[in-house]
């Protein structure tokens, strides 16, 4: 405070006017970053929702999300944040009653028969996991394997699929595998670049 500012707050208090002064500008900036992030996240959700209007449940691809490449039987089901972004992106969890990081049997996966398989961010292990699935006779009857629809989940500063600010991008990325996917990849890259620039620059 300067002397004049202190006197001003005293006068306000004398007249019953509540007031607050702040000098922690880092905190104020953090609030601005948070508000900007929420705007970006909600904007991406609305963008995808606008493309999914009229999409029937039976048109949504069933998605199996494998938690990590080192354990192909650990999955994230419909009762998890992963299941939520799958739904927002235009798909539906092939194991809707399972929660987060649950161990299932290969038989239950075969019976569920997912249209799409996504393997959670596993660094340099993810490609080996994809090849292992493709080579394993037990998985060959699954639609996602037969149609070569097995994908590695992206990683940025942190895996996009869980507990990350880049969850805002995850919804856009996941939408690429829905029936209403955005054929104009330029839009996706523009949104990706804008997100990275806006969130990073403001920190």
Q: What name fits each language-model region?
A:
Residues 1-32, 39, 96, 100-141:
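Acidic/His-rich segments in extracytoplasmic proteins that coordinate ligands and/or metal ions
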Residues 77-80, 132-134, 166-167:
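Short, glycine/charged-enriched secondary-structure capping and boundary segments
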Residues 128-156, 164:
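Extracellular/periplasmic periplasmic-binding protein-like sensory domains
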């Amino acid at each position: 405070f300067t002397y004049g500012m202190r006197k001003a707050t005293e006068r306000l208090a004398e007249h019953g006017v509540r007031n607050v002064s702040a000098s922690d500008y880092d905190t104020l900036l953090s609030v601005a970053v948070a508000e900007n992030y929420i705007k970006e996240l909600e904007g991406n959700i609305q963008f995808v929702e606008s493309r999914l209007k009229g999409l029937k449940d039976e048109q949504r691809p069933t998605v199996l999300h494998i938690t990590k490449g080192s354990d192909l039987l650990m999955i994230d089901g419909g009762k998890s944040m992963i299941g939520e972004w799958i739904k927002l992106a235009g798909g539906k969890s092939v194991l809707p009653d399972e929660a987060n990081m649950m161990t299932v049997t290969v038989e239950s996966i075969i019976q569920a028969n997912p249209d799409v398989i996504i393997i959670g961010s596993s660094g340099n292990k993810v490609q080996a996991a994809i090849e292992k699935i493709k080579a394993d006779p037990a998985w060959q009857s699954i639609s996602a394997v037969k149609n070569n629809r097995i994908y590695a989940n992206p990683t940025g500063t942190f895996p996009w699929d869980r507990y990350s600010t880049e969850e805002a991008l995850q919804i856009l990325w996941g939408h690429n595998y829905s029936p209403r996917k955005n054929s104009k990849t330029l839009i996706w890259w523009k949104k990706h670049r804008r997100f990275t620039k806006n969130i990073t620059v403001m920190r």
